[in-house]
Amino acid sequence: MNILQIDSSVLGDNSVSRSLTASVVADLVAATPDAKVTVRDLDQDAPAHLSGNLLPVLGGPKEGLSAIQEAELQRTEQWLAEFLAADVLVVGVPQYNFSIPSQLKAWIDRIAQAGRTFKYTENGPVGLAGGKRVIVVSSRGGVRQDANELDLHEKTVDIVFRFLGITDITYVRAHGLAMGPQFREAGLASARTEIAALNDASRLAA
């Protein structure tokens, strides 16, 4: 089993989402000792954001690329290969200003490629990256409410992964982290309970 751990928080060792993605991965490895883990730190190795200069890297002819574009192409191919090879993705998604970290969006822009991870048909787009399992570690300072229109960070990653053909998506939520010690501890305890529930043998059998 190939596990891809994606961390996008800018808080380093102080990050809740990073500590929780590490816990999820540790439990997965304990259940499947031969698992191969790849860790992609999008803060320390941040993808360049989408720009006109970057567009040739993401599609079209690859002849005549500049040295910078060629380097970005190699990075893009590495990230795409990691994504395609993964059986399980563990993705840390903190909420920043209602949405996902910009470096996570930049990574999505690299791996969401027509003809590679999805295709267009006469009946609409079809995802080509199905068969994977995604575990989203969602962290936020406030408290989530059902159907909250402000939960854009979870909605964003859910839409993206489903667009790419992935339907097995589980959430581990650590919320209320900025609302004082009592809410913070309750949020962390809830997340730890959800992580423990991931160890259902039937879910890990594959």
Curated annotation (Swiss-Prot):
Its cofactor is FMN. Gene3D superfamilies: 3.40.50.360. It comes from the Bacteria. Keywords: Flavoprotein, FMN, NAD, Oxidoreductase. One of its GO terms (molecular function) is oxidoreductase activity, acting on NAD(P)H, quinone or similar compound as acceptor. Its EC number is 1.6.5.-, 1.7.1.17. Transmembrane segments: none annotated. Binds 1 FMN per subunit. It catalyses: 2 a quinone + NADH + H(+) = 2 a 1,4-benzosemiquinone + NAD(+); N,N-dimethyl-1,4-phenylenediamine + anthranilate + 2 NAD(+) = 2-(4-dimethylaminophenyl)diazenylbenzoate + 2 NADH + 2 H(+). It holds the Pfam family Flavodoxin_2. PANTHER family: FMN-DEPENDENT NADH-AZOREDUCTASE 1, FMN-DEPENDENT NADH:QUINONE OXIDOREDUCTASE. Quinone reductase that provides resistance to thiol-specific stress caused by electrophilic quinones. Belongs to the azoreductase type 1 family. Homodimer. This is FMN-dependent NADH:quinone oxidoreductase. It comes from Cupriavidus necator (strain ATCC 17699 / DSM 428 / KCTC 22496 / NCIMB 10442 / H16 / Stanier 337) (Ralstonia eutropha). The gene is azoR.
